[in-house]
Amino acid sequence: MPKTFHRTDRVSAQLRRELGTLVHNAVREHGLPSVSVSDVEITRDMAHAKVFVTALMPERSAEAVAGLKELGYRLRMDLARAMKLRHVPELHFHYDDSVDRGEHIDNILRDLPDTLAAEKRREGDDE
């Protein structure tokens, strides 16, 4: 029976767990805006990893990502100590706006009944 998970999937899950802890500590130590690691995508050759983070305050997301990029080398060294990998991937931090987009869609759907009711009233007034 073939494996259902590739090594890159397992490594990216482990990176997500370890980086979650390291980023949490970095936020406290360096006064960065509060962020959490939402996903890690690793390249097939495991040389690069895209680290997606979400911020509690989306308006400060750029500041948080910039701070994490500055700390990238240190975080990579901490990962090397925590994980048993021959080569720790280079970290590339990105803001994950999927939560913001989901919230926007939720607001649209929540306002939809009011919009439809207003449209029906306008159609009734036109007749």
Swiss-Prot record:
Annotated GO MF terms: ribosomal small subunit binding
GO biological process terms, semicolon-separated: maturation of SSU-rRNA
One Gene Ontology cellular component: cytosol
Domain of life of the source: Bacteria
Pfam families on file: RBFA
Keyword Cytoplasm: yes
Record-given protein name: Ribosome-binding factor A
Organism: Stenotrophomonas maltophilia (strain R551-3)
